[in-house]
């Protein structure tokens, strides 16, 4: 069965590249560059995985994570973040969400596509 992913990143080049790679590897991908549009489009119990950028205008990844969780508590969600911010953002999300989030649910940008595919497949299959 085809796995379905929702990809949200405010950088069109990032969404285009990741979406293309994922679709070429058998995933169905809906992608958005606007987090508000993505949330309004969101379908409960439809996605196997949501990939969120952290730093976005209008609504950051933490706020979007919280809103999606309220709507669909069981969906798997992972975050995109730049390497320079990784440690800072990882600590922040633990504080914001008040629980331990496994480091495996963070993807550092820039990412090697082979590593991305391995990580996403692993998360989906957990």
Task: Annotate the PLM regions.
Residues 56:
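Receiver (REC) domain active-site loop signature in two-component systems and cognate sites
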Residues 63, 84-107, 114, 118:
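Alpha4 helix (beta4-alpha4-beta5 surface) of REC/receiver domains from two-component response regulators
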Residues 31-49:
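Acidic, metal-coordinating helix/loop segments flanking the phosphotransfer/catalytic sites
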Residues 12-30:
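Two-component/phosphorelay signaling modules centered on CheY-like receiver
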Residues 9, 53, 81:
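Active-site residues of response regulator receiver
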Residues 33-34, 60-64:
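Acidic catalytic/metal-coordinating carboxylates
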């Amino acid at each position: 069965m085809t796995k379905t992913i929702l990809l949200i990143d405010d950088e069109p080049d990032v969404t285009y590249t990741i979406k293309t790679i994922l679709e070429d590897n058998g995933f169905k991908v809906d992608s958005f560059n606007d987090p508000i549009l993505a949330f309004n489009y969101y379908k409960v119990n439809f996605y196997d995985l949501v990939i969120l950028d952290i730093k976005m205008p209008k609504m950051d990844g933490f706020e979007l994570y919280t809103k999606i969780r309220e709507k669909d508590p069981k969906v798997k969600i992972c975050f995109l973040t730049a390497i320079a911010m990784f440690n800072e953002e990882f600590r922040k999300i633990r504080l914001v969400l008040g629980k331990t989030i496994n480091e495996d649910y963070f993807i550092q940008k820039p990412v090697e596509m082979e590593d991305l595919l391995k990580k996403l497949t692993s998360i989906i299959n957990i």
